[in-house]
């Protein structure tokens, strides 16, 4: 099983949404994939989720960011305890920031990195990003600009 942690997933429109969906959907052709995604519009998301490949399971979490992160993590813990996880993939360092400190270190992690999300706002922000990257097994950059970071 593969687990994908994301804030950005269709039916919302956007480049990261498309990237994460296509990655998840293609991986689900060979392996069961569970996507833990943020919830934004229940009606359109319910319709979207019902028309997906059965090997791709989407679980959505709404509410305040503080609780949403923790609820996703509780689900991730449950999934890890019941299944053999091959890899955890996140759409950004932000999706991995909370669970990276708590997940079993024997499960490989991959973090997708997009240029505008690593623009550093201050030293604390930079440290948060770097801490997640240091604990991540593979960092996948979408451009040479991002790779230079």
What are the roles of these predicted feature ranges?
Residues 1-3:
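Extreme N-terminal starter segment of soluble prokaryotic enzymes
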Residues 74-84:
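Short, well-structured alpha-helical segments in soluble
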């Amino acid at each position: 099983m593969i687990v994908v942690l994301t804030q950005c997933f269709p039916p919302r429109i956007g480049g990261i949404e498309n990237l994460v969906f296509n990655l998840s959907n293609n991986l689900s052709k060979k392996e069961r994939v569970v996507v833990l995604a943020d919830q934004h519009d229940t009606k359109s998301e319910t319709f979207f989720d019902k028309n997906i490949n059965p090997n791709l399971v989407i679980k959505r979490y709404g509410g305040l960011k503080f609780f949403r992160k923790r609820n996703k993590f509780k689900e991730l813990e449950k999934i890890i305890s019941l299944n053999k996880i091959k890899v955890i993939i996140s759409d950004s360092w932000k999706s991995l920031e909370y669970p990276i400190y708590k997940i079993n270190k024997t499960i490989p992690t991959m973090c997708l990195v997009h240029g505008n999300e690593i623009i550093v706002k201050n030293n604390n922000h930079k440290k948060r990003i770097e801490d997640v990257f240091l604990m991540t097994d593979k960092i996948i950059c979408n451009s040479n600009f991002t790779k230079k970071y």
